[in-house]
């Protein structure tokens, strides 16, 4: 009797999971049906003969046309031009059959009188492509399978074209039909692709509903749902259309070549590739649209791979910079190359490796966090944007997972004395977080939220506080050293080009800044022991203002473009000069107007970038899902951040101000870096995307949860995570429809 309630509860949870899976599969089927209904006739054509001089009548013997096809070019059928001579016949049917040079039938397509009225082009497409391995001549047989009550003609040339004779029965006509080769055709492919998505999306919906209904541990929920929905993103995102994916692919490919002892650079400085990869590498964002989708899928299934030998010179430049954040993608690509997989399979291996590492890091972050913060981290980790990045080759996915882990560990250490493994993990996370993008370097300051007495067990009183502050200073110093080791050369070049500083001056400023940070920490520890924190914050604020004034004064003395230089323009109409710190200090009003205008015009796009409701590379394609999904995600995150009535705040008042300051530092750093590549002719910031601020989203939600406002009687983490998972699933499906429905991509 004791087990019956539990058994019934498990059945209810299982029923919820099955219902969610059924709804997800039904949504996939509807998406496939809708896309097939709208796009099934979409095709692209190559002209074989464009001469429309005379007619060839379709007789009982039929017509036979020979069509040469080059090797490697897909053939989905042909398109012919008919003429019923201004007559709409009540009956009749035409069949077009394609045969290989060896006489093997590739398939036959029939069209009846309803499709052939007047002077009209009629396509006869096959569902799957035939790709000849060598140059080949195909045979096109045209027959009337049902008699026509009148004359039906096809347009042709006055004379026979070279190698393309036309026969009526066995008699040569001495002409060539006006024929177009169908090189791409949508057909029923959208439905097939939607059914492929039904597996990861249905499984993800089942696991989300089942685990959340059972109130399972949120780390397991995060890992399972992130993997399933991320797999769907791997399939939905067209090749090389994720943010900067073509650049990331070149970096990963070169690193994989080095690990496998293959040459990486040709004589012209271009990247060396395998033979099967060379046709697909590029230096720009890939194509989208249902035809591009199907071409990539066909190539993935049919194109052979190559041995892991780089012999062909590609388009990308060799020697592009990269760091350790590419490790998962490099290993995935290396495995695919070792197995001899083709290009698209290799790309999928790299994406899946990136997704796997992100899911593990996201689950680790949720496991490290205190229970009150787990819902926030789970909701943030399951947003469409981090999963889209994880389902591509972007190193930002690894960075997001590491920042989430670092924040979660800092929150964890606020609740108890640190164990040895936690101290080591804190130092490791600070060191590996720092080397990536400079805008995230201020995030290591989050370790200051840890009470210093919690950092070293076995000590008490003033000694514990002092040693704790020293440990925090050591963590910050380790992060700074790690960043300098990875980015010192880049930083010196940046300061030299955008701030007018030489290398020695930049190093001196960095050393002074590090000394100031250490002095501030020591002063804070001393004031805290003497209970004079208010005096410290006053002096600190005055010091910040003085430092800002000094920077402003020094920047005003640095050279900036003259008015004559500022009117110069490149051939594309842009200014050759970008915003710099000295320029901003010289022209404060112009800079402020540009920033305010950017905030007004681009803030919705930044929010979309944080949530992930704009897909792919927004600078190239604007793939925006419904604003209702974005609104739902904002509300779900707000629900996840609601504090429980009677609960203890995660952050103290001073700590909350410190976290807010850290977030502000990251935002300011992102703005300054974006200004450095914004031409002076622009009226808004160029290239600042919302995803740059995504790693700090949980910190913002923590501040909202810490605020005194609306309280709820019980934890809202599970409903919020269910809502985020559902909306992410809908984003994937609508994104698939928008990607497929994009016109003009081929």
Language model feature labels by segment:
Residues 392-399:
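Short acidic/glycine- and proline-prone juxtamembrane loop motifs at membrane-interface regions
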Residues 187-188, 458, 463-467, 473-541, ...:
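Membrane-lumen/periplasm interface segments of multi-pass, membrane-embedded glycan/lipid transferases
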Residues 7-100, 116-134, 144-200:
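Beta-sheet-rich sandwich/jelly-roll-like modules and their strand-loop junctions
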Residues 259-349:
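Interfacial juxtamembrane loops and adjacent helix segments
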Residues 216-220, 341-344, 365-384:
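Transmembrane-helix signature of polytopic, membrane-embedded enzymes
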Residues 348-371:
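Transmembrane-helix motifs of polytopic, lipid-linked glycan transferases
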Residues 422-438, 443-449:
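Membrane-interface alpha helices of multi-pass inner-membrane proteins
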Residues 1-30, 189-231, 471-472, 528-545, ...:
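Start-transfer (signal-anchor) and selected internal transmembrane alpha helices
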């Amino acid at each position: 009797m004791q087990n019956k309630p539990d058994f019934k509860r498990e059945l209810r949870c299982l029923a919820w999971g099955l219902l969610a899976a059924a709804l997800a599969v039904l949504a996939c089927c509807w998406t496939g049906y809708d896309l097939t209904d709208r796009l099934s006739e979409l095709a692209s054509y190559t002209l074989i003969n464009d001469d429309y001089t005379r007619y060839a009548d379709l007789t009982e013997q039929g017509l036979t046309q020979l069509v040469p096809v080059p090797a490697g070019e897909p053939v989905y059928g042909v398109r012919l031009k008919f003429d019923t001579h201004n007559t709409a016949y009540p009956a009749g049917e035409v069949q077009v059959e394609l045969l290989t040079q060896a006489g093997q039938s590739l398939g036959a397509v029939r069209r009846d009188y309803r499709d052939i009225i007047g002077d009209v082009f009629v396509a006869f497409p096959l569902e799957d492509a035939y790709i000849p391995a060598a140059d080949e001549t195909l045979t096109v047989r045209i027959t009337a399978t049902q008699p026509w009550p009148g004359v039906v003609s096809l347009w042709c040339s006055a004379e026979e074209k070279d190698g393309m004779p036309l026969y009526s029965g066995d008699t040569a006509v001495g002409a060539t039909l006006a024929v177009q080769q169908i090189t791409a055709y949508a057909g029923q492919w959208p439905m097939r692709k939607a059914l492929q998505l039904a597996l990861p999306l249905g499984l993800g919906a089942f696991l989300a509903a089942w685990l959340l209904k059972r109130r399972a541990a949120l780390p397991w929920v995060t890992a399972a749902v992130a993997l399933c929905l991320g797999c769907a993103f791997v399939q939905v995102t067209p090749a090389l259309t994720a943010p900067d994916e073509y650049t990331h692919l070149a970096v990963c490919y070169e690193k994989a070549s080095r690990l496998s002892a293959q040459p990486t650079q040709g004589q012209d400085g271009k990247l060396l590739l395998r033979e099967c990869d060379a046709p697909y590498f590029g230096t720009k964002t890939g194509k989208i649209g249902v035809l591009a989708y199907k071409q990539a899928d066909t190539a993935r299934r049919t194109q052979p791979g190559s041995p892991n030998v780089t012999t062909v010179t590609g388009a990308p430049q060799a020697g592009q910079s990269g760091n350790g954040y590419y490790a998962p993608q490099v290993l995935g690509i290396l495995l695919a190359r070792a197995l001899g997989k083709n290009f698209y399979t290799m790309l999928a291996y790299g994406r899946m490796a990136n997704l796997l590492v992100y899911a593990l890091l996201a689950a680790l972050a949720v496991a490290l966090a205190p229970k009150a913060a787990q819902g926030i981290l789970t909701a943030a980790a399951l947003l469409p944007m981090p999963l889209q990045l994880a389902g591509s080759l972007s190193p930002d996915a690894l960075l997001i997972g590491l920042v989430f882990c670092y924040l979660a560990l800092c929150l964890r250490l606020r609740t108890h004395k640190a164990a040895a493994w936690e101290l080591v993990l804190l130092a490791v996370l600070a060191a590996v977080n720092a080397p990536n993008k400079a805008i995230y370097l201020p995030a290591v300051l989050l370790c200051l939220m840890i009470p210093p007495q919690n950092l070293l067990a076995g000590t008490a009183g003033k000694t514990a506080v002092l040693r704790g502050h020293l440990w925090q200073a050591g963590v910050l110093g380790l992060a700074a050293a790690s960043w300098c080791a990875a980015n010192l050369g880049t930083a010196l070049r940046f300061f030299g080009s955008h701030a007018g500083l030489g290398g020695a001056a930049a190093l001196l400023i960095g050393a002074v800044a590090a000394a100031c940070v250490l002095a501030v920490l020591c002063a804070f520890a001393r004031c805290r022991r003497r209970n004079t924190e208010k005096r410290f914050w006053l002096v600190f604020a005055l010091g910040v203002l003085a430092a800002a004034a000094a920077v402003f004064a020094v920047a005003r003395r640095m050279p900036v473009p003259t008015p004559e230089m500022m009117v110069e323009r490149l051939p594309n109409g842009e200014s050759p000069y970008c915003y710099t710190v000295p320029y901003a200090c010289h022209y404060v009003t112009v800079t402020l107007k540009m920033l305010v205008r950017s905030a007004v015009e681009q803030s919705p796009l930044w929010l979309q970038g944080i949530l992930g409701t704009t897909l792919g590379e927004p600078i190239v394609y604007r793939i925006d899902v419904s604003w209702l999904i974005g609104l739902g995600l904002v509300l779900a995150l707000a629900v996840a951040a609601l504090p429980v009535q009677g609960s203890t705040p995660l952050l103290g008042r001073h700590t909350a101000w410190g976290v807010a300051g850290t977030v502000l530092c990251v935002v300011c750093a992102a703005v300054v870096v974006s200004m450095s590549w914004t031409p002076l002719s622009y009226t808004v910031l160029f290239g600042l995307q919302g995803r740059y601020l995504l790693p700090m989203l949980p910190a913002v939600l923590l501040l909202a949860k810490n605020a005194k406002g609306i309280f709820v009687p019980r934890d809202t983490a599970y409903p919020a995570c269910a809502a985020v998972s559902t909306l992410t699933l809908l984003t994937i499906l609508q994104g698939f429809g928008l990607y497929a429905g994009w016109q003009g991509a081929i």
